[in-house]
Regions:
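Glycine-rich phosphate-binding loops of nucleotide-dependent enzymes
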Residues: 2-264
Length: 264
C-alpha cells in the first residue's frame, strides 16, 4: 500500500501549550487507522490541521501529492478529504437528503446566475448532487434512505444523526474520511453497529479511514493500525495488540486516570 496522507514534524501551539508536538504520521491507501490517547492528547487538533481549520505552526501535510498546509477547508475538501466532528453538526430543520446534499458544496461550481437561468450545466450538476446524496444514504438502508430522506434531521434518533454526518462525508466523493469519536454518546449495541459500518465503508465503498475513538472495542474491531498520542506527541504506532501493550500507552492512560481519581 502507498501512503495517501503523509504528516511530518507537525506542530501546533496555543500560547505556551504544545497541542501537537512534532508528530509524524502515514495513512496508507485503503487502511483503517485509529488515533487514540487521553483527553487533551492532540487528536482533534491533528484533524483540524489536516482539514484546514487550523494552520500548522510547523511541519508538513501532504495528501495524494498535494501540500495541504495553508489551504482553506473547502479546497482540501475538493482534494478528497471529508470529516465528522465530536459533536453532531447538522442543520436540524433541513431534511436528511438536504443535509447530505450540503456536503457537496465544495464540488459545485454553478453560481447564482446559473441557478436563476436554469442553465444546462446547473441542472446536470443538481442531478449529480442528488444522485450522489441518495447513493450515500442508501448505504445506511432504512435508517436514512427511503421515506426518511424527507424527514427533518431533528426527528432522527441520536445514532441516526451520527450516521447522517457520515453520509454527508461520503457524499463529498472523498478518498479519505476522518471520523472524530463516531460512537460518542452511543450505547453498546449502537457502538457495535458503528464498528461494523466503519469496516463496510472501507470494504464496500473503498474509503480510507482515520478514526479518533476512546472505545477500545471499536478500535480493536476495525483497526489495521493504531497510533497513540499523549501531550501532543506520538508515543506508539503499530497493530492494536502492539499499541495496547506498549508501556508508554498504559502509563498515559493509567497516569491520567490516577490523577483524575486523586483530584476527585
Amino acid at each position: 500500500m502507498s501512503a495517501l496522507l503523509e504528516v511530518r514534524g507537525l506542530v501546533k501551539h496555543f500560547g505556551g501549550l504544545n497541542a501537537v508536538d512534532g508528530v509524524d504520521l502515514d495513512v496508507n491507501e485503503g487502511e483503517i487507522l485509529s488515533v487514540i490517547g487521553p483527553n487533551g492528547a492532540g487528536k482533534t487538533t491533528l484533524f483540524n490541521m489536516v482539514t484546514g481549520l487550523y494552520v500548522a505552526d510547523g511541519g508538513s501535510i501532504h495528501f495524494d501529492g498535494h501540500d495541504l498546509v495553508g489551504l482553506q477547508p473547502h479546497h482540501i475538501c475538493t482534494l478528497g478529504i471529508a470529516r465528522t466532528f465530536q459533536t453532531v453538526r447538522l442543520f436540524p430543520a433541513m431534511t436528511v437528503l438536504e443535509n447530505t446534499m450540503v456536503g457537496q458544496h465544495c464540488r459545485t461550481r454553478s453560481g447564482v446566475f446559473g441557478a436563476v437561468l436554469r442553465l444546462p450545466r446547473t441542472r446536470a450538476e443538481e442531478r449529480r448532487v442528488l444522485e450522489q446524496s441518495r447513493l450515500a444514504l442508501s448505504f445506511f438502508g432504512s435508517r436514512l434512505a427511503g421515506y426518511r430522506e424527507n424527514q427533518p434531521a431533528f426527528a432522527l434518533s441520536y445514532a441516526n444523526r451520527r450516521r447522517l454526518e457520515i453520509a454527508r462525508a461520503m457524499a463529498t466523493n472523498a478518498k479519505l474520511i476522518l471520523l472524530d469519536e463516531p460512537t460518542a454518546g452511543m450505547n453498546p449495541r449502537e457502538t457495535q453497529e458503528m464498528t461494523e459500518l466503519i469496516g463496510k465503508l472501507r470494504d464496500e465503498r473503498g474509503f480510507t479511514i482515520v478514526v479518533i475513538e476512546h472505545d477500545m472495542r471499536l478500535v480493536k474491531g476495525v483497526s489495521d493500525r493504531v497510533v497513540a498520542l499523549d501531550y501532543g506527541r506520538k508515543i506508539a504506532d503499530g497493530t492494536y495488540d502492539e499499541v495496547a501493550n506498549d508501556e508508554r500507552v498504559v502509563e498515559a492512560y493509567l497516569g491520567k486516570r490516577a490523577a483524575e481519581e486523586a483530584a476527585g
